[in-house]
Every structure is written in C-alpha cells, then in structure tokens.
Amino acid sequence: ETALRGVRFNNTWVPSETYADSRRGTLTGQYPQRQATTRISEVFAGVGYEVREDTQPAGEDVFRLLEQPSPEELDQVEGVIAVCSLLGGNAPMSVLWPGVAENGENNELVSPIDLAPTLAAIAGLDVRPNARLSFDGLNLVPVLRHGASGHAALFFDNGVRMIDAALIDDTATPP
C-alpha cells in the first residue's frame, strides 16, 4: 500500500480468485476466462516503445513492467505509474498521471484488468470498442480526467459484483 501513487481506487476487485489468473488478466486487459496471451508490454513494443523490466535509465518512449517493485524502485521512475495488488478481493490500485491524476481517491467500481486499456489510451493508442486493439478492461482515462463512471458490473467465474451489490459463490450482499 505504501507504493500507491496518484489517484487511489478504493473499489478495486481482482479478476480471479487465483493469483495466476489475476496476473494474466491484468497483463492482457482481458478476463482470465479468455486465456488471452498478448500482454500489454507486447502491445507497447509493437508500436515502437522500449519495454523494460527495470528502473535503469531509458529513452523517451519506454514502457516499464515492474512486478512487485519496492517503493524505493518506484521513486526512481518518472511518468505515468500504475500500481495494483493481485492478492484477493478488494485490492489496492492507483494511477499516477502527472498533470492529470496526481492525488485523491476514487470510489468507482474498477479492476486491475482496466490498467492495460488505460495505459494504452494514455499513450495515444486506439482503445475504443471494436478497435483493432481490444480489451475487456475499461479505459479509465474518462474516470481520471472527468469523473466518469467505472464499471456497472464486474463478472467473475464465481459471480458478479456491482457498485451496490454482489452475488459471489451463491451469496448475495446486501441480502
């Protein structure tokens, strides 16, 4: 949680009960059930970005994928920074976008699968529905810039979660 920077999302739900499936969903921007294999880092590499998995100095157009970085490592990185946890249920997530999303909290319903389309949109890639680059996740740029709504619902193997209710493992809340 100390690694969170920028706008903190308080209503963030991981896409799967398992870490491996949540990781796949986050790296692809697709629900894990799709078994997608194209990672967001490959998308950025395909449009000319240098892809790095470290904090070493790099060129101007660089996409960094740092898994489980320390807060000190994140302090070395400049530009847009997205941080999330994939450890069960309501998990911490934040987006730092200098000049746009530098602090505050947001209570919209979101998921780590939203990071891939959000980062792609910030980089100027076309992430509109039916674009060549397709994601299940929601582009959070309108949420960050204009206070737009997040998801109406998130769908999981074991149920569905909405803003004000959930049906998970045959248990409804509120009942």
Sequence positions of predicted segments:
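Formylglycine-dependent sulfatase
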Residues: 1-175
